[in-house]
Design a protein with these regions (language model features):
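Sec-dependent signal peptide recognition
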Residues: 2-8
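C-terminal motif of bacterial Sec signal peptides marking the signal peptidase cleavage site
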Residues: 15-16
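N-terminal "domain-start" segment that seeds a small globular fold
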Residues: 24-56, 76, 141
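Conserved helix-turn-beta segment immediately C-terminal to the redox Cys motif
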Residues: 61-62, 71, 75-99, 118-122
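Thiol-based oxidoreductase modules, predominantly thioredoxin-like and allied folds used
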Residues: 67, 92-109, 124-136
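Short, internal strand/loop/helix patches
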Residues: 112-161
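Thiol-/selenol-based redox modules, centered on thioredoxin-like
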Residues: 141-144, 148-195
């Protein structure tokens, strides 16, 4: 008798749960989820001089975005960055530098000090933007785009250190992320520029 009562209770519970499950419906027929891949052309930032830089002016160009620092072991990459910029700038290629103080406080200077350092030590002529944050809660909008797959459509990434490179194709879309230690003159980078 005890087993029969237990069986009846189990059956009643099972059927009551089935009814509840059948009554819950999620209507997805009229819902369309659209994730549109963004591009860099939506961004406007300030350069080191305080002038507005509009990324939409770069349509049709390949772009390398790199976070920079003046007091880093990788700072000599400025020389290689400037070299490839000079060599390929007339072939629809541009480098955009974003000074950042996120790693070891290796970019403590003001915008004016950064501009002076870049010019005096490396003759930098490629566009340098206002100092920004490239990670954490105060990460700037363009780096949110670069590091979040939901925005760039390619991949999630963390900025590992100073001089991480983001390669943007002619349509303003993120195409590749290059590690900080990889030189700007690496064959994989040059091949991408020339392709």
């Amino acid at each position: 008798m005890k087993n029969l009562l237990m069986l009846a209770c189990s059956a009643a519970l099972l059927f009551s749960c089935q009814d509840k499950a059948q009554n819950i419906k999620i209507d997805t027929n009229n819902t369309e989820i659209v994730m549109e891949k963004q591009n860099i052309y939506q961004f406007k930032v300030e350069d080191l001089s305080g002038n507005t830089f509009d990324f939409s002016t770069l349509k049709g160009k390949k772009v390398m975005i790199v976070n920079t620092a003046s007091k880093c072991g990788l700072t000599p990459q400025y020389k290689d960055l400037e070299a490839i910029y000079k060599e390929y700038k007339d072939q629809n290629f541009v480098i955009i530098g974003f000074p950042a103080n996120n790693f070891g406080s290796q970019e403590p200077g003001t915008n004016e000090e950064i501009a002076s350092f870049c010019q005096q030590n490396y003759g930098v002529t490629f566009p340098m933007m206002d100092k920004v944050s490239v990670k954490g809660g105060d990460m700037c909008a363009i780096y949110q785009f670069l590091t979040q797959k939901s925005k760039n459509g390619l991949e999630n990434s963390d900025v590992a250190w100073n001089f991480q490179k983001y390669l943007i194709n002619e349509n303003g879309e993120l195409e590749k992320v290059i590690a900080p230690q990889t030189l700007p003159t690496d064959a994989s980078v040059i091949d991408w520029i020339k392709a």
